[in-house]
Amino acid sequence: MEDFKKENPYGLVYDNAITENVDGKVNIKPVNYTLNGLKISANLYLPANYDENKKYSAVAVAHPNGGVKEQVAGLYAQKLAELGYVTSAADASYQGASEGEPRLRDYPSNRIDDISGMIDYLIKMESVDNSKIGALGICGGGGYTTACSQTDKRIKAVATLSMFNSGRVRRNGFLDKQKDTIQERLIKSANARNKELEGEIVYEGFLPDMNDEELTKYMESLPEGLYKDGIYYCGLRYRHPKATGSYTTASFIKLMAFDVEDRMDLINQPLLMIAGSNADTLYMTKDAFEKATGTKNKELYLIEGATHIQTYWKEEYVEKVVNKLKDFFGENL
């Protein structure tokens, strides 16, 4: 995978990714645009036989924490384009190929505005019907998509896949098991911010700096679940050099004050939340879904047998997700 750029001219690392633009098929168009003074890197996916004089429904796709547009976000953007949608998958500000210093800053306000930035770009396209724009967020991108949709009503239909409540986990720990160390970790974050003033950037992350053999052994030592699967996906099978699984330690200051569940009642758009029935992150989707009291059109859809990360790549689960998204966006856009 070190030579992934040679394998795919667009740097895409997901299965069955576009390798060239062919007439009569979905095409990919790398684009850049400015958001809050930063150049954002995005991939636009155009449906087969795209005609710029026609009007299309569109979907913005937000990538997981620690990920990039060339991974699962690109997979689902391509799948939705195959269904006839114009789609966009953009790298978050400070992450991937998008600008921003320090690298890998992970502020919720930025991630939320990144989604609005994708909507901005789609709205400027003459071929997009502005009344038919939806959003799909995956993992952390799912949490930020629900947060964005609470107030950005240009989003007409909201979908999440394996939603991850970044603020809750950074604050309480995974499965809410680190509540007793909240203050200690806040002090650690404050100290990291002080170090940033001196030019030293401190990072947190789940992907250790190891070669393939070492990483495989480390992965095999972990219990089944999100982090073991995450190393397989991000560190081995679908790795990308800009998807490090890391974020600045100083980001904790902002992350720990954020919670997806806050103001979920402001979502009045159609809402679809998809998760694997065996995902150890399922509690986050269920809790957020329960608080989405402002919409009468909502559904929690479980992919039987799937774990969190398996919804990113396992063909049988991806197919079920795409079929559900086909129905949801077809009915609501």
Residue ranges and their predicted role:
Residues 6-54:
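N-terminal cap/lid segment of alpha/beta-hydrolase-fold proteins
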Residues 146-231:
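Alpha/beta-hydrolase-fold enzymes
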Residues 105-126:
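Alpha/beta-hydrolase active-site loop
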Residues 66-78, 92, 285:
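The serine-hydrolase catalytic nucleophile loop
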Residues 267, 273-275:
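Short beta-strand/loop motif that positions the catalytic acidic residue
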Residues 54-64:
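Short beta-strand element of the alpha/beta-hydrolase
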Residues 306-318:
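Catalytic histidine-centered segment of alpha/beta-hydrolase-like enzymes
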Residues 79-99:
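Conserved alpha/beta-hydrolase
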